[in-house]
Amino acid sequence: MTMKTIRFPPLLLALAVGLAVACYWPGLQGNYFLFDDTPNLEQLGVFGGVSDWESFRAFVFGGVSGPTGRPLSLATFLLDDNTWPSQAVWFKPTNLAIHVLCGLLLCWGTLLLLRNFRFEEDEAQWLAVFSSACWLLHPLMVSTTLYIVQRMAQLSTLFVFAGMAGYLHGRLLLPERPRAAYAWMTLSLGLGTLLAVFSKENGALLPLLLLVVEFCLPDQPSRPRPARLWRAVCLWLPSLALLIYLARQIDFSPGIWPRRLFDQPERLWSEARIVWEYLRLLFIPQIEGHGLYQDGYAISRGWLTPWTTLPAALGLLALFGAALWARRRWPLVALAILFFFAGHLLESSVLGLELYFEHRNYLSAGLLFLPLGQGLSFLAKKYKPALALVVGGVALCLLAGFTWQRAQLWQDEDQLLLYWAASNPDSPRAYNAVVAILTVRRQLEQADALLDAANERFPDNAMLNLRRLLQKIFARQASERDFELAGQRLSRQVFDMPAIRSMRMIVDNVLKPDTPLFYKDATLGLIEAMERNTTFSRFPEQKQESAYLKGRLYLAKSAPAEACRQYQYAIGLYADVEPALMMVAEIASAQAFDCALETLALAKKALDQQADRSLRRSRESYESEIIRLREIIDQERQK
């Protein structure tokens, strides 16, 4: 008996899709946004909602993520809502639909791949369905699918899988219809790469991934490879361009990434350990890992610090060598490994990204389960098809069970964040999240005790220092001494982006009408302490933020002259008409009309000096807004 005895791969695929939807269903009820969701989606409401071309252009082409801004991904968020604040439950079903589409495209592409390998049709169908079902039902994909902003990674993967499938379809046509074949391959590669890149930059890997496929495909007289010239232009050239780009990023100088707590060698050492952890989670799945609190991950400071660094690096080299060796004897094993490595090339190598994120496996793991499917095929041929069916079914059910339990955990934000915090005792962000939850629950004594313990454990962490002060400001219990102590610590602590956000939160709360008057002066002193911090200069945006926050505080203190000076200094640092106009509106609202007109002139100057491509709206729209604001200010001034 062979796999031909059982002829229901399409039914199994349909069951896998239905099972995936059922497993993810609890997670769709989680009505909360996480981390990077808000910075990327709050722009929906900046202009009163996306309701016309100007607001559409501003949102879709004004993205802040990556070099491209990822406009295609941003455009899809408009399928779910066109304003902000919004409801997370409106976005998550779209993410799940994309996940299912990715699984179906992966299945189609894998089937076409196996046909290129000249597998028998029945076996190819079973292998394609099983391996793609493993990917579709794997619990590691939950943190990509239910984390709304990771739609960017999903869409990029979707177009990569589509491009691969179209390319492999065209490749099958080469012997009999070469013109159609090259049309399919060229269009699929070009369009797939373009759409994927404008979803997320990982899409640039498509030519390299197809080179990996070509490398692992055996030479077959009846299945000719694409012409050398075509491969050179369409596959080798873009792949080499990507590799050259990465090579140009190599810089082992200390302090190359001022916003990171590691340098480039330390990142590479750490990634060697992290990639093995990814592989462990993929082949030994668990319900929930460390989540998004990875700031406590132990950075490798050398080949033997920690000692696992060198074995991890040597192990990856050995795995890569084994894949090259296995290319002819076990090509699917070689393909799975090399595809995985190629998929991690951008995000797990020399670029200054954060160290660890599960979503980096969403694309990379696409072909990783093919060797497992081939193992089941061996069982079916050597023993009985029923045995292979039972083993494969049990594996898929286990994956589905873990995914369902993980989706249950993702249903409740507090439950999820508390779990992550318990799993990451070395993460300052985890402590900060638990304190926020306890504060919302009005468990203030527990929150204060936890913060005190966290500040003792992480004395150099500016975010936790500012959070402790913020807790006292919330309760209107902060004294001048509290501000002084926080400032003394802040002047020598390691400064980072979470600390910048914490400072803005402090100013927002200090400016509320029921706060003690001395809070404003004390906060100005705190900002000055921050400016004395030696790591402060690493963050150019914080200089403009600092001036802006000072302007707000002086304006609230009824010191319009100094407020005007700080606002205008901030505008010069921003060099952007958008925040400039926002500041003009704030100044005018405080009835400092002379300052508002002076600042409006600076906003006009910023507009004149700004390139069209950097504008979030059309130049005409800004010019009309400046005229409108000037008229309003003049009218108010004359009353």
Residue ranges and their predicted role:
Residues L418-K639:
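C-terminal luminal/periplasmic domains and tails of membrane-associated envelope-modifying transferases
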Residues T2-K472, R476-E480, E484-M497:
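Polytopic membrane enzymes that build or remodel cell-surface glycoconjugates and lipids
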